[in-house]
Every structure is written in C-alpha cells, then in structure tokens.
Amino acid sequence: KDGYLPGNEGCKY
C-alpha cells in the first residue's frame, strides 16, 4: 500500500 507507518520515518508499507 502507499502510505507511511506511524513511528517509522520514510518506511513505506
């Protein structure tokens, strides 16, 4: 998916 996980800067899931 296109988005950023909270707590992970620049880590896309």
Curated annotation (Swiss-Prot):
Location relative to the cell: Secreted
Keywords: Ion channel impairing toxin, Neurotoxin, Secreted, Toxin, Voltage-gated sodium channel impairing toxin
Record domain LCN-type CS-alpha/beta: where: 1-13
Tissue spec. comment: Expressed by the venom gland.
GO cellular component: extracellular region
Coiled-coil residue spans: none
Transmembrane segments: none
Domain of life, source organism: Eukaryota
GO molecular function terms attached to this record: ion channel inhibitor activity; sodium channel regulator activity; toxin activity
Family classification: Belongs to the long (4 C-C) scorpion toxin superfamily. Sodium channel inhibitor family. Beta subfamily.
Described function: Beta toxins bind voltage-independently at site-4 of sodium channels (Nav) and shift the voltage of activation toward more negative potentials thereby affecting sodium channel activation and promoting spontaneous and repetitive firing. This toxin is active against mammals and crustaceans.
Domain notes: Has the structural arrangement of an alpha-helix connected to antiparallel beta-sheets by disulfide bonds (CS-alpha/beta).
Protein name, as recorded: Toxin TdII-2
Lineage: Eukaryota, Metazoa, Ecdysozoa, Arthropoda, Chelicerata
